[in-house]
């Protein structure tokens, strides 16, 4: 039940409006405060007196504005510590529990929103909105905007997601780490729980540090120190929002036996794209083991005589997407030296119906290769901007992630391999 509170109105959007928190009948679980900066602390006090357990505030005007604002923020912090009131903000867009369809979030969510197992914590509200509205169609469980973190901070939200059964992947947009010990403990708990933490940390340049300070009052730490911090706790680092999404999507949906090697098989339908992807894979240190004689013999039986038998494999030559192409993918995936299969196939959402039908066969072949081999299979669409919904459903149902963008897709695969290797080694790199 929603209870608007404003002494100036009798109703708001059809809901009866109350003159004060005290006037609301029954229990109040949480409160969204849409007031100016100087009204936040008095409202928190009123909420606590009313028995409210959690509060979110949208207002800015605190530590990011200078000493006067910082002093107000410290008062909020001290009050919340003394009372145990859970406070999200200030200067943030709130949070959304996507799984259960509840929350206090200052923006509408897309109509076609994918529920999933990726929990996001962003210290920038605009970034959280961008991720939530992205056409890349990541499946989210929770969206959390932490803002200035006057009371609850990054470590608190991470602890929540580590314990959350609906969240399997934790994605972070970080401007600063205010509580290194708490965040380190949360990262360790995430690692022990088998939940990957993927972080985009800004502030490598002097300009970015200044922007962070004026945005949320954040003090960005040494880039070298933070790199070492993330390496120590096996946090996957990315550089762009697209990379953050694609890497999270891969970890969210990849099925098959984990591998610590970098030996991959790759199938393409284009010689040009094969060369492009080979360069990118080389940049990320991925290896293409040669085909076994048995593998070559199997491919020789399903591909035309002129088709080159190699890894990466150009399997388009047969033109037979119903039998020859699926068979060639399965043969490549079953190669003893191949631990993961990348299928390169562009699948933009605006394709003609005939192409959608054609490339649906490619998606089905990728699913069959995963089932036949028991190994992880990933589809990479080199063009971003959305995947044809019917094709996505085939891949989702078959446990095959589809990634958008060549660099983002290959980078996500490399990150998954690195993460598996670090877990197997169980090493903690020392801080500088």
Residues of each region from the PLM?
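Catalytic-core regions of core metabolic enzymes
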Residues: 1-432
